[in-house]
């Protein structure tokens, strides 16, 4: 009887230990995945920033300001490099429809000899930034990086709101660049 009780107690301790170890491993994996998600979000934030610059410069160039072409080429190369760096995360991003949309939009924007109007290209690039923001939002919500799905007023969720507000400013800057380029190239102002 004592031996049976001792064996039962030993089995119970082993099961509890295995359960605690599995729980600890699960937490560790989740924390590791969350760190990877943060690295992805940092990279996507850089990509958003460069796409916004690309949008403003390309709208300015297409509106007639040829002095911006060298800067546009440089930013275009940076955007290409950032998309290339995102390939590391492709297995994780593959499941996000917004990422696929972003890739398709970049291909359309980056086509040489695009016969698109400046306004249509501006719209495509704005859609591209929105797709990237949606990708960031999906990652943030999946790994609980925003409190209560952005409903909480705590600072933990404000970073995502800040990205959306920066995009509104970026749209305004792009339009302003185009307007300035158009007015500068008018014969009568």
Question: For the regions a protein language model found, what residue spans apply to each?
Answer:
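Hydrophobic alpha-helical segments
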Residues: 2-189
């Amino acid at each position: 009887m004592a031996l049976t009780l001792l064996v039962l107690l030993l089995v119970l301790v082993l099961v509890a230990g295995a359960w605690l170890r599995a729980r600890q491993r699960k937490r560790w994996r989740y924390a590791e995945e969350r760190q990877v998600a943060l690295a992805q979000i940092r990279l996507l934030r850089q990509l958003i920033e460069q796409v916004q610059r690309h949008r403003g410069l390309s709208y300015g160039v297409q509106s007639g300001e040829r002095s911006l072409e060298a800067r546009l080429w440089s930013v275009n190369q940076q955007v290409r490099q950032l998309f290339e760096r995102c390939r590391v995360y492709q297995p994780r991003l593959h499941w996000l429809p917004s990422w696929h949309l972003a890739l398709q939009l970049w291909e359309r924007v980056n086509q040489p000899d695009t016969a698109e109007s400046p306004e249509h290209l501006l719209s495509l690039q704005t859609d591209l930034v929105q797709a990237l923001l949606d990708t960031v939002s999906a990652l943030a919500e999946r790994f609980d990086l925003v409190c209560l799905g952005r409903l909480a007023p705590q600072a933990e969720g404000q970073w995502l709101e800040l990205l959306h507000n920066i995009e509104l400013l970026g749209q305004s800057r792009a339009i302003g660049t185009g307007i300035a380029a158009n007015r500068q190239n008018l014969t009568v102002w």
